[in-house]
Amino acid sequence: IYRLPREGMSVSRPRRSQCPGCGTELSWIENIPLLSWIVQAGRCRSCSVRISLRYPLVEASNAGLWYMAVTLAGPADWPLWLCWSVVLSGLLVATMVDFDCFQIPDEVSLGGCVLAPLACLCVPGLQGETLLAQFLSAGPQGGVDRVGALLSSFAGMGVGAGVLLLIGALGKRIYGAEAMGLGDVKLLAAGGGFIGPGGALVALALAALVASVFGLLNMLRFFILSRSRARGRGRSVGIGRSLRVARLAGRYLPFGPFLGLGIGIVLLAWDDLSILWL
C-alpha cells in the first residue's frame, strides 16, 4: 500500500522495509504483522518516530478477510479459500491506495486480469454458481468444468470493463468531463474475471448504491462545514451558496473502494445474491 503509488518503489524494491521516518531498514523481527507494532509500542526502534496506527489496522483487516474466506469456503476447500483470500487482499490494497492517491495500481487491476482466468482454469469453483459458467460447461448438469469457468471469466472481464467504459463515455458526453477513471474500469474487469459477468453487474450495482449514500453524507458534511466556518468568521452565507459548495466539494470520492466492496461481497456471497438478483 505504501510502495505501489510511489515512484521508484515496488513490491520487491527496496528489498526490505524501511522506517518512514529515518529510512533504517527493518529486520525480520520488526516486520511481524501486528506483533511487532505492539511490542515496539508503535514506534521505530532506531529513531523512536511514531508509526501510524493504520499499519496494524490494515494488517488486522487483512487477517480478518482471510479468516472470513476460510470460514465461508470451508478449511478443506483450500484452493477456493486461497483464491478468495488473494483477491480480497488485492481489493484491500486497491481500496487503501485509491483513498490516498485517487489511483488504483496496475499491479492490482491488470495483475488481477491476468490471474483471474488462470485461477478459474485451475479452480473452476470460483465460477461454480454462475449460470453462464454452468451453461458453457460440458460436464454434468449444474456442474462447472474448466472450459466453462474460463469462458465465464473472460466474459466477466469483458462485461466489467465494457459497462464502465459505456458509463464513462455517456458521462463525458452529458457532463463534458471524465465520469469514470480507467483505474475503475480495470478493477471491475479484474473483479469480473473472478465473479463472472452477472457478478460484475451486481458488484457495480452494490458499489453505486453504497457510493451514493456516502456521497450524500459527504456533501452534507461539507454543507455543515461551510456554514460553521462562515459563522466562525462572522459572515452570513446563504443556504444556496452552501449547497453549491457542498455539491462541488463533496461529490469527489474515489469509486475504487466501493467497487472493491461490491466485488468482495459478490465473491463471498454470490449464492445468496444470485437468488435475489434472479
Give a label for each model feature.
Residues 1-278:
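A membrane-topology feature that recognizes alpha-helical transmembrane segments
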